Amino acid sequence: MSKKQFYLVREDMLTDAMQRTLEAKALLSAGKVRKINEAVHRVGLSRSAFYKYKDGIFPFHAIAKERIMTFSINLADRSGTLSQLLNIVADTGANILTINQTIPLQGRANITLSVDTAPIEIDINELFERMEALESVERVELVGSGS
């Protein structure tokens, strides 16, 4: 049996049936519907399409739980910016494992941040949004993850 490959794909790149499968699974897991038939009817998906994709597509946060994630972040070189970023991460309940900051060149520094997301209290996407919302943050990328 061959090893399964996993890919991180942006939502807008998924087919309509895949997106609707995720919606149906969310309805079921939230208890908003009790049966698969109800879920697929509500999102406008055939049962056969649901069964085709249900075991192969997952929200990013479901895969990312209990993982160590490594982010590459470009920060403007201003006093207190790294502290603000670290506070955002710490406020989620995540455990910061390593921090590596380059010497600021031409007004910006690169931060490599490894974070244990097992204790995180919010969705991983929300963490991305909070980090990107900082005025001093120019870019946030997930560069690796593992157990």
Swiss-Prot record:
Matches recorded under CDD domains: ACT_PheB-BS
Pfam families recorded: ACT
Transmembrane segments: none
Cited Gene3D superfamilies: 3.30.70.260
Ranges where the ACT domain occurs: 70-145
HAMAP family: UPF0735 (MF_00707)
Family per record: Belongs to the UPF0735 family.
Identification of the protein by name: UPF0735 ACT domain-containing protein ABC1543
